[in-house]
Amino acid sequence: NWSRNDYDQLAGALAAGHIIECGAQATGGNYSFFKEVPTFKDIGYPIAEINQDGSFIITKHPNTGGLVSVGTVTAQLLYEIGSPAYVNPDVISHFDTLKIEQEAEDRVFVSGCRGSSPPKDHKVCINLAGGFRNGTELLLTGLDIEEKAKLITETIFDSVGGKEQFDKVDIQLHRTDKENPESNEQAQAFLRIDVMSQNPDLVGRLFSAKIIELALANFPGWTGRSGVVPSGPY
């Protein structure tokens, strides 16, 4: 039965919540030292056993994959925090006061968290729709890749009415091809074209359909990795 002024206990609970909020990321998932994880099959989700004083155990269900270690818990603790003073509407949890210990296999004990009163102001996130986008990825093969990329790009935008009608155009040529390829896969470069607009029709199915129409009407040896697709919001 904590009061709103039991800041140390609240800070410990906040730390526990932060550790388990991303699920398996605290039990070995997305962990830089992934070779330490015995298995990723049936990875267990984290469990927080919180004590009256605000200390807690992080563990997982037995006979599940993954790993609960000082490393996995610390990695998640540092995830998306910005400052060691982790701000919450109820308390500020000072993560630099925490003590993290391996209690047993897949059991980590976290204690010592100090808390302070919450701030008067809070951060608010507002997400705005940017518009609509469509894109395609083309595989270019053979010689003269740079010239081929320039040719197909110019042809695509000429057929849809020009680049200037879009709010933004992003063109990227990735030279994954090798100079002396030993297979078809080694001979391929990737050309990525993305277009964005407030008008969904401008970047809709017509845009991708125009690219498909060029399959037999441009240079030889290229193909697309996507068909005719509608636009999507961003």
Indicate residue ranges for each PLM-predicted region:
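Conserved phosphate- and dinucleotide-binding cores of soluble alpha/beta proteins
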Residues: 2-10
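Serine/threonine-rich low-complexity intrinsically disordered regions
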Residues: 3, 39, 88, 144, ...
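Residue-level detector of functional hotspots within protein domains
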Residues: 5, 63, 110, 124, ...
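A conserved active-site cap/scaffold subdomain adjacent to cofactor or substrate pockets
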Residues: 10-117, 133, 137
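C-terminal non-catalytic interaction/assembly regions of soluble proteins
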Residues: 120-234
